[in-house]
Amino acid sequence: MEVEEAFQAVGEMGIYQMYLCFLLAVLLQLYVATEAILIALVGATPSYHWDLAELLPNQSHGNQSAGEDQAFGDWLLTANGSEIHKHVHFSSSFTSIASEWFLIANRSYKVSAASSFFFSGVFVGVISFGQLSDRFGRKKVYLTGFALDILFAIANGFSPSYEFFAVTRFLVGMMNGGMSLVAFVLLNECVGTAYWALAGSIGGLFFAVGIAQYALLGYFIRSWRTLAILVNLQGTVVFLLSLFIPESPRWLYSQGRLSEAEEALYLIAKRNRKLKCTFSLTHPANRSCRETGSFLDLFRYRVLLGHTLILMFIWFVCSLVYYGLTLSAGDLGGSIYANLALSGLIEIPSYPLCIYLINQKWFGRKRTLSAFLCLGGLACLIVMFLPEKKDTGVFAVVNSHSLSLLGKLTISAAFNIVYIYTSELYPTVIRNVGLGTCSMFSRVGGIIAPFIPSLKYVQWSLPFIVFGATGLTSGLLSLLLPETLNSPLLETFSDLQVYSYRRLGEEALSLQALDPQQCVDKESSLGSESEEEEEFYDADEETQMIK
């Protein structure tokens, strides 16, 4: 039997898969979220003052906001460490890299730069780890990246200088982004396809909870070095537990390592208490073994090319709008810890809604993704029609702040869906490469996002126009993708040989290779059960849709 049939025998979501969900979608995501937003508290700037009389004895007191601030910034550039320690005093009850290395005034850009280094590392990690895990296996690459992630993260807490901190943040980003991506794929490949949406949504939900958890830890641990080190205790526990999980049976199957795939499946069956389960994996005669994918394969086949270009844009927009709305919301005032917790908790309602909608036949993955993207885009576009001053009446409720919160809720939902949707659109042999490439473009959106709020100086609603236009465009483009709800999971490129789909009323398009040498037989007559569903066919016989 094939691997999908084997999962029906061993259990698609048994006791052991529930444990894997708890490990890789709950505990791991709590840790991943902590590292991803570490700079929010570690890089926060405490309140401070300087000895104005000593620094600027001739400065007029009446020109404080303009002249004195500029003079103080100029002085920081030339003053040595001992002078800064003598004249600058932090009054807050917590420490950070800003207070330790005086990253204030003209030096404050270094805090943002450290955050950029982290996401630059994630940019590198998501694409490189995807290819490595497709070639060497999910578990090996996941564990290696996880161990290095913890090592570099602990090194953050012992940083002797800003430069060392920035370098280790880049390395943490590379390992954190890469290993979490591989863990997501590993988890999905250990459960039945019907439960992919649930597993993915749980991960997104607990990433949001992880933000609130980090705020709580920061409230009690006010030393940035202690905080940066202690948050890795949770990661260490997850790493030790991960040593005993199996390799992905789907990856082993796609590589032709049938005996090892059977061992992994029998382990799952044993932990699911299905001791009498027996099966033997076989490959169809037409399927080549040890098939591997590369980055170029995403653009070699016409179907994969179309999917990849649309998905890259959607991932880019999700990241751009998510981080852009967060930055343009402004300072809420009050406790930094309460604000950070709220920024995570506000995302939580979107996840149960996602789990419900994407599993409904009348909505599915495609329509739900499109609806959330379009709703978020429209919410942002409405801002351009609102008055800039809105203190009374209906505008006290319907304003840029409330609409941006709605936008963040919807984009959080879309981000969760696109993760699940993307993993279902690519075959196993290239799934990590596809996810890594799309995730890479989301990091580009995250890098650009901080610059969008500054457009308010041109026109106050211009940032929302950018977010709304890109969100609405990506929502419409998502309708060009096929539905994957209850569809058989693609394993290898041969599963794409006679793969067809309908696109906006056009006739079905069979797979074609851009390279003439890669062209496959296109003479099979294809059909579709409905205009709303897509079918996957094996090269020799039709594989029925899973209802």
Curated annotation (Swiss-Prot):
Catalyzed reactions per annotation: (R)-carnitine(in) = (R)-carnitine(out); O-acetyl-(R)-carnitine(in) = O-acetyl-(R)-carnitine(out); glycine betaine(in) = glycine betaine(out); N,N-dimethylglycine(in) = N,N-dimethylglycine(out)
Keywords from the UniProt entry: Amino-acid transport, Cell membrane, Glycoprotein, Ion transport, Membrane, Transmembrane, Transmembrane helix, Transport
Annotated GO CC locations: plasma membrane
Topological type in the membrane: Multi-pass membrane protein
Glycosylation sites: 58, 63, 80, 106
Membrane-crossing segments per the record: 22-42, 111-131, 141-161, 165-187, 201-221, 226-246, 303-323, 338-358, 368-388, 401-420, 433-453, 462-482
Family annotation (Pfam families): Sugar_tr
CDD domains: MFS_SLC22A15
Expression sites (tissue/organ): Expressed at highest levels in kidney and brain. Expressed at high levels in skeletal muscle, heart, liver, placenta and white blood cells. Expressed at moderate levels in lung and spleen. Expressed at low levels in thymus, small intestine and colon. Expressed in several intestinal tumor cell lines.
Alphabetized InterPro entries for the sequence: MFS_dom, MFS_sugar_transport-like, MFS_trans_sf
Main location: membrane
Post-translational modifications reported in the UniProt record: N-glycosylated.
GO-annotated molecular function: amino-acid betaine transmembrane transporter activity
Region called Disordered, residue ranges: 522-547
Similarity-based family: Belongs to the major facilitator (TC 2.A.1) superfamily. Organic cation transporter (TC 2.A.1.19) family.
Protein function: Organic zwitterion/cation transporter with apparent specificity for amino acids and their derivatives. Has low affinity for its substrates and may regulate their flux across the plasma membrane at high substrate concentrations. Bidirectionally transports carnitine and acetylcarnitine, possibly regulating their cytosolic abundance and further fatty acid catabolism via beta oxidation. Displays high transport activity toward zwitterionic substrates such as glycine betaine and diet-derived ergothioneine and carnosine.
Protein name, as recorded: Solute carrier family 22 member 15
Organism: Homo sapiens (Human)
